[in-house]
Amino acid sequence: MSQYSFTSESVSEGHPDKIADQISDAILDSILAQDPRARVACETYVKTGIVIMGGEITTTAWVNMEEIARNTIRDIGYVHSDMGFDANSCVILSVINKQSSDIQYSIDHGNTSTLQRGAGDQGLMFGYATNETSVFMPAPITYAHRLIKRKSQVRKSGVLPWLGLDAKSQVTVAYEHGKIIGITAVVLSIQHACDIKLTDLKEAAMEEIIKPVLPNKWLTNNTIFLINPGGRFVIGGPISDCGLTGRKIIVDTYGGIGRHGGGSFSGKDPSKVDRSAAYGARYVAKNIVAAGLADRCELQVSYAIGVPHPISMSIETFGTEKISHDILMQLIKNFFDFRPYGLIAMLDLLRPIYKETAVYGHFGRECFPWEKIDKADLLRDAAGLKCTP
């Protein structure tokens, strides 16, 4: 298919599912700050006036989970009862147990070497990278995130103070022979104050959010802009919809272009391969593309509970590889450690860095260690390629 289009979406920090993700990761960070070896699996549910946190946590740390949840909600901006969700008055319930001793034993099972500890569960994870953007991410999800981040910036800075906290974006990108030829559609739905006219909202969103973010070279007279196509959007956030940790896994990753193994990230410490192996697979894919060994790369890795080494690993480069898959796989095995605690050591994951991941995507942002391209030169030299990508 020489011509095709692809659409991805993002959601704002005030979207109910993202509130839940941020609370879960805020709790994780607070625990890791005191106890880097803690085992954490924290899920959060939010609805009008209530937050419920549940999961399994084994740690020597003590944290005030209610205070963390309230501060997170407050930082997002839900601070008035007329919003239907208020950090100061919402009910917060916690149902937390310790991690199962069976799971703990299956991971540790008497190993004195940390690197030989097994995976905490079975599962499959994917990592993806492409050279179509400077951050080695697909363009649809990259610009969907940037629209939402820009929306947050203009609200917080007072440029558009009447914007609400809840919002969604959607960007459709057209391709020809695998190369971007334009943006065909942009959808932006933004919560707003009740006295704002839809015409004013559309004009402001176009001038202050869309135009500063989207490359002008990709916009044409045929590009469709749908700003609040449903009309009035005054009621939003948890009063409108319930939110749950891990329900925006495609927003969190590649917007649907790269495949997903099904496991969510937020609220999970890095001993969970759902999170750490997905980060590791992204690290590998990005370095392969940055090295010029392929234009696109997707890596799958799978694990069995209690087993330290991956059960399988496979690579897909969509016909863009510059060297064979056999050589690529050998390079991965030579330069990357996919044992669960090898990943933790390689990416320095036992740190409180996770709340920042809970909005605007886990990938394509240079502040995270799995986004480094520090092995690109090494891979290129080992592959015998002398040219730069």
UniProtKB/Swiss-Prot annotation:
The keyword Transcription does not apply. Catalyzes the formation of S-adenosylmethionine (AdoMet) from methionine and ATP. The overall synthetic reaction is composed of two sequential steps, AdoMet formation and the subsequent tripolyphosphate hydrolysis which occurs prior to release of AdoMet from the enzyme. This is S-adenosylmethionine synthase. GO terms for cellular component: cytoplasm. It catalyses: L-methionine + ATP + H2O = S-adenosyl-L-methionine + phosphate + diphosphate. Its cofactor is Mg(2+); K(+). L-methionine binds at residues 56, 99, 241, 272. Homotetramer; dimer of dimers. Its main location: cytoplasm. Mg(2+) binds at residue 17. It is found in: Cytoplasm.
